[in-house]
């Protein structure tokens, strides 16, 4: 059994990326895995100040917000699912803030290592256009020693709920079941 952390970064509740994450979770739970879902829209996570205090004081950020509860979850997970709607060919602001604020556990080979990652992106454009966003996510994984990307889902949809009935839903379920 793996411990899975599913990060939903969309600011829109019930949006397409969250629907895909829910399918991934369904498959993973049916396979017997322990899954926790974290919705960043429900968290107060300020942007990184780049003060590097966390690198000097054992990994504690000077900002007192919800990132303090997200960091341990990232470290404890065996598998991390990162989902984002594509905004201007990149990740949404909520996910970018979380990524930047994970410096205390990822810097210089820090405390986070050997994770399996799955990426879920959604956009109205075709999968080729989402590749830039996937590259952004890959950059994060490249900073975490021993970590690998095990799967990617390109959800082509725009309006909330439009992803229902599309092949990406089945792909998300199957990736969750096989992880």
Predicted regions: what they are:
Residues 1-108, 148-149, 161-179:
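N-terminal beta1-alpha1-beta2 submodule of the flavodoxin-like/Rossmannoid cofactor-binding fold
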Residues 9, 40, 122-124, 155:
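Cofactor-binding loop segments of dinucleotide-utilizing enzymes, especially the Rossmann-like FAD-
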Residues 87-89, 118, 140, 154, ...:
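Sequence-level detector for tyrosine residue identity
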Residues 93-94, 107-151:
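Short, glycine-/small-residue-rich phosphate/pyrophosphate-handling segment
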Residues 158:
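Active-site rim beta-loop-alpha module in soluble metabolic enzymes
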